[in-house]
Amino acid sequence: MSTIITIPRSVSWKGDAIAVLNQTKLPHVTEYKTLTNIEDVWKSIIMLEVRGAPAIGIVAAFGLALAAKKYDAINIYEFQKKFNRDCNYLGTSRPTAVNLFWAIDRMRESIREITTIKEAQKILEEEALHIQQEDEMVCRSIGEHALTCFKDGDKILTICNAGSIATARYGTALAPFYIGKEKGVRLHAYACETRPVLQGGRLTTWELKQADIDVTLITDNTAAHAIRTKEINAIIVGADRIVENGDTANKIGTLNLAILAKYFGIPFYVAAPLSTFDTTKQTGAEIVIEERDETEVTKIFGKQVAPLGTPVFNPAFDVTPHELITGIITEKGILRGDYKQEITSLFEK
C-alpha cells in the first residue's frame, strides 16, 4: 500500500551541498538539483524550484550552513559579518513567506554568542537539521489536529500545494489526508489547479496520487460549482503568513474560496505551523504581497497566449480576513474565535 514515504523529500542535506526536488519539473520529471552555494539557494527559491513556506525556511537554513563552511574568515568577527550579509541576501528572495525570515533569525541567533569559527560552523549545520526534523514532527501534529475536523468520506477542497513537498514531510493542509489514510479515515481531495503556476494541478495531484489518496482536479473557476454539485464538506488551505489578528496571506485565490465557504455555509480552515505566524504585524494590511513576473500569466509553458504588451497584475498571494476563517490549525491545537487573544496567548507561553 502506498504511503507518504513514497513521496520524495523536498530538501536533503548532503554535508557539502543541498539536494532540492526541482518542483518546476513536476509532475513529469522527478529531478533533484544540487545547490553548492548561497547564490544557488537564492535562485532556487526565486525560481520556485523549492517552494512552500516551511520548505523555503528549511532550504534557507541549510543554505546558510553551507555558506558558513566556505567563508575565508580570519576571525569570528569577520565570519559573523559575512554570515549576516548572507542572511540579508537570502531575505530578498521572497518577501511574503514569513518562515524564510523565521529560519534566518533562528540561524542567526544560534551563533550569536559563539566565539570560534569551527564551533559556529558546527552549530549552524546542527540547527538547520533541527529545523528540518522539527518541521516534520510539527506537520504530523497539524495533521492529527486537522483530522478531528473531518470524517470518513468527506470531500475537501484545497488550493495550491500545502503538502509534503512544501514542507519537511506531511505538509500542512494536506497532512490530514495522510494521517487519515494511516488511521483508516479516507478523505477525498478536490484540488484547484491554481493559476498561473499550477501548483495544484502539477504538485498536489501528483503527491496525493503517489500516496494513493483520492484527488479530483478542478479549474479555479469551478470552485463554486463544485461546492454546490459535488457536496464539498469543507475547505482547507495552507498559509504563508498569519498576523496577530488572524488575517492570513496565502496563495492568490484563497480569499475567493473563503468567501465561497461563507456563502455556502461550509467550514474554511487554515493549517500552519507557529513558524508561519508574524506577531509583529497587527493586521493583514501590513503584509507585503509579492508580485511576480508578467510572463507567468502571458505565457503557458513558454508559449505566448496573451497579446504582446498586455498589462498584467500578478500578485502571488492574497489576504483572507480572520472573520472568514473557521479555525486555524496549528501543532498546538485549533484556534477558534478570538484569534488575537489566542495567538497572543500562544506566543506568551
Curated annotation (Swiss-Prot):
Enzyme class: isomerase
Alphabetical UniProt keywords: Amino-acid biosynthesis, Isomerase, Methionine biosynthesis
BP terms from Gene Ontology: L-methionine salvage from methylthioadenosine
Catalytic residues (positions): 240 (proton donor)
Presence of keyword Amino-acid biosynthesis: yes
Known catalytic reactions: 5-(methylsulfanyl)-alpha-D-ribose 1-phosphate = 5-(methylsulfanyl)-D-ribulose 1-phosphate
Pathways per UniProt: Amino-acid biosynthesis; L-methionine biosynthesis via salvage pathway; L-methionine from S-methyl-5-thio-alpha-D-ribose 1-phosphate: step 1/6
Recorded family membership: Belongs to the EIF-2B alpha/beta/delta subunits family. MtnA subfamily.
Protein name, as recorded: Methylthioribose-1-phosphate isomerase
